[in-house]
Amino acid sequence: MNFELIYVSSLLLGICLANQADVVPSDCNLPADAGMCYAYFPMFFYDASSRKCLNFIYGGCGGNANRFWSEAECMEKCGGGGGGGGSSDGSQKTAKMLNLDLGDICSLEKKVGPCKAHMPRYYFNRETGLCEEFIYGGCSGNHNNFQTKEQCESFCAPGNSPRPEEETRKRTKQSY
């Protein structure tokens, strides 16, 4: 009798563990939520019904945890890791979706905007070739605006944006 109970228990445990791979984290079942602010951040959310990561625009504050900077990050967290290459690849997909060029985004000047929020952000400084902190006001910014230094560095990585020395070489050649 005890052997049968142990056998059935282990069988049920095995079934539960096998099905656990199909379980999506609860955050991934939340709907896309732009939040209550009016900034413009292209993001991805996991759509549990289609089992895909879809794009949406995040307003910069509020919202929920079903929000990712890249399709790859979204798929890794919610879709079982089948989302393709790293965050740089996801950044390129996001930019292409919005008809933006990564070099153009990373070349934009920092833009605080006219609103009075106090949101620490990072932008890529083309002159120094580094991601630097600035205070974003919460509205009317541009795409060179990242929540973390890591996101900025990933998006404006050396292979993605023109470096100051490349720009200088181009201008020097054009001057002659």
Curated annotation (Swiss-Prot):
This is Kunitz-type U19-barytoxin-Tl1a. The record marks 38-39 as: Reactive bond for chymotrypsin. Residues 28-78, 106-156 form the BPTI/Kunitz inhibitor domain. This protein was not detected in the venom by mass spectrometry. GO terms for molecular function: potassium channel regulator activity; serine-type endopeptidase inhibitor activity; toxin activity. GO terms for cellular component: extracellular space. Disulfide bonds join 28-78, 37-61, 53-74, 106-156, 115-139, 131-152. It is found in: Secreted.
